[in-house]
């Protein structure tokens, strides 16, 4: 259980850091056949990364995350993340931050590595 929290914390830190500073690297967090839902719209990884790299610069603040180990043949982890994001070009004021809520399923890539 403790390792699932460690992996979740590492994922959240790396993913949102990449989202803010290295969007071209976001694809490394997904398998080639991953299906992504963005505001209810299903997309493949290539479509998703193309969309992400064209968004304005952002500053993300993760407010909270929770993780639970999912039992099965492999140890997988479900992560729920909430926070705020502000896109460049918006004047800083109380309404310039947009809340987000995301759910991820980390799937074991090797016997000891999720990321």
Curated annotation (Swiss-Prot):
Compartments it resides in: Nucleus
Pfam families: NTF2
InterPro entries cross-referenced by the UniProt entry: NTF2, NTF2-like_dom_sf, NTF2_dom, Nuclear_transport_factor_2_euk
Lineage of origin: Eukaryota, Fungi, Dikarya, Ascomycota, Taphrinomycotina
NTF2 domain ranges (all copies): 7-115
Gene Ontology biological-process annotations: poly(A)+ mRNA export from nucleus; protein transport; ribosomal subunit export from nucleus
Gene3D superfamilies: 3.10.450.50
Protein name: NTF2-related export protein 1
Domain of life: Eukaryota
One Gene Ontology cellular component: nuclear RNA export factor complex
Keywords, alphabetical: mRNA transport, Nucleus, Protein transport, Transport
Function: Stimulator of protein export for NES-containing proteins. Also plays a role in mRNA nuclear export.
């Amino acid at each position: 259980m403790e390792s699932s929290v460690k992996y979740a914390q590492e994922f959240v830190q790396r993913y949102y850091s990449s989202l803010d500073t290295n969007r071209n690297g976001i694809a490394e967090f997904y398998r080639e056949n991953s299906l992504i839902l963005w505001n209810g719209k299903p997309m493949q990884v290539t479509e998703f990364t193309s969309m992400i790299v064209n968004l304005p610069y952002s500053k993300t603040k993760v407010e909270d995350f929770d993780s639970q180990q999912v039992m099965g043949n492999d140890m997988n982890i479900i992560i729920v993340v909430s926070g705020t994001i502000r896109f460049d070009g918006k004047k800083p004021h109380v309404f310039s931050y947009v809340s987000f809520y995301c759910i991820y399923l980390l799937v074991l890539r090797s016997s000891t590595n999720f990321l």
